[in-house]
């Protein structure tokens, strides 16, 4: 059983009526977005990567784009039965097992202070940390690229220490 809620003409949310473990929304006529439940974390992202690997071989799929704990799938043609697509995606999600993608470490030079630190005083005020503590915490961390952005070279990163998070 599928419950459907119209949000506006080009997007409708389609969720399972009995379980809301993952949420699927239609984005236009040929695209669907599966959003992982729970927190923004590596566990959910690893399942998204696994789901992306699973659906890439679907013959009717034009493209799949992993995002931040979500996956956008774009079909070659408008599906005749959107509810069947939702069921297929949710089943694939339920069967997805965590994977870890091989990558490489890239060191990015960072300049702390001066004209590059316009938000550092606000961060220090919010966190209660000194500027040296903020720099140390930020510098010691290793960040993982969860997804690529729409601009070349832009990566969405995970791994920021909560002590230096800015809303």
What are these regions (language model features)?
Residues 1-167:
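Conserved "landmark" site that anchors the functional core of diverse proteins
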């Amino acid at each position: 059983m599928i419950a459907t809620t119209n949000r506006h003409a080009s997007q409708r949310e389609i969720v399972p009526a009995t379980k809301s473990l993952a949420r699927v929304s239609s984005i236009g006529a040929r695209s669907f977005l599966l959003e992982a439940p729970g927190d923004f974390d590596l566990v959910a992202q690893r399942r998204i990567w696994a789901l992306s690997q699973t659906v890439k071989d679907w013959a009717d799929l034009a493209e799949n784009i992993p995002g931040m704990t979500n996956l956008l799938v774009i079909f070659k043609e408008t599906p005749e039965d959107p509810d069947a697509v939702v069921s297929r995606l949710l089943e694939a999600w339920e069967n997805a097992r965590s994977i870890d993608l091989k990558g490489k470490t890239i060191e990015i030079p960072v300049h702390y202070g001066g004209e590059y630190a316009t938000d550092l005083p606000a961060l220090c005020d919010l966190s209660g940390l000194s500027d040296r503590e903020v720099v140390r915490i930020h510098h010691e961390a290793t960040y993982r690229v969860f997804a690529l952005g729409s601009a070349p070279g832009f990566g969405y990163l995970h791994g920021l220490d909560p002590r230096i998070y800015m809303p």
